[in-house]
Amino acid sequence: MAQEERAAQTLWLREAESGALNVAQYDPASGRLAFVAPGAMAAGSSRRFTLVAAARDRQDEVRHPDHPVQLTQKLDRILIQAQEQTWATYNYLGGRRPYFWPLLGPAGASVVRGQGTGEHPHHTGLGLSYGGHSEEGSANIWSDWDEPPYGPGGRMLHRGFRQLSSGPVYGQLVQDVTYVDAYGEPIVDEVRTIRCWWATAEARFLDFEFHIQSCRDRGPQPFLFMIRLATSMAIPKVGRVSNAAGYPVPSSKPGDRLYRAGWVDGSGPMGGPPPPPPTAAPETLVDLPGAKVPEQRHDEGPWNGIALFDHPANHGFPAMVGKYAVSQQITQAHYPPPDAPHGPFTFRQRVYVHAGDAEAAGVAQHAADYADPCRVEVRG
């Protein structure tokens, strides 16, 4: 699939009441205009904006927002930048499936754990997995094992980008992905759309749309959106997981970890200051006898979090949480709808990276905004 480097058109919206200018992003291909309205809006209230083609002066031009999003493609990853900071990296080659890591919170540390760290090393970053533990014959693109009992596993293969676009409000990529089973046979064709944007430096968002064109696998075919929370959060001893259902994590009932929720949030401290630069040769590996393992400092530093929102239009909403997961991981399972067991079907999720815990960051309200957004009327 040929890649399109789509240039976003910058326009401005002038708010009727305050006269302030707000930057907007117009996509000529879809005919859609996107902008972030500053401040908060109470339910039932309204605001008026007038579309203008140019700002009066340069100072007026950048009133809001001041964080355009830039996507930069490398050979194996996409760097997502705002305010000259790479705050998210989408690794689309080199693993069994694409994933985000690092994903920086406002404190400057990643709110998700990287690859090969600690227990369950296949719990990597943030991304979509598939198949679970191969129940009823579904392919396993989850455990990352080559051998039994959880292998051999399949892969999600990057086939190309249909679109990579940067802009004053958001950046977006559209990707073709094919899933193959352990024997290299294609089983799923997917078109993945990821939109990246900031409301403020303390509120960062990733919007996902997974369009499953066809699914030719056996079994229940679970699509698993997963977030492995940062080790520094020290969940559940220090950090915490909260959710719309009010379900305790970890559960007070041994073995009972499944629940349904429209949103789930994990938050905790981002750790102490970074370790000093190494003084030994890089060949001194931490797994050699007598080597000193770098100290990992928990319950220190500013508190950040990450929330996952389910969308009411998804089949089975609110979807099941906790399958194939430990307390330190958020996993939400989506299944093909009965009327399209082999596709096509689509499901959507939003990720909210924030300062503070779920209550301080208004996670429940942001989830409600995602489920029932503002209505926009355009008048000539």
Stretch-by-stretch model annotation:
Residues 1-66, 90-169, 173-176:
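Alpha-mannosidase-like glycoside hydrolase catalytic domains involved in N-glycan trimming
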Residues 45-57, 84, 175-177, 192, ...:
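Short, hydrophobic/aromatic-enriched beta-strand segments in well-ordered soluble domains
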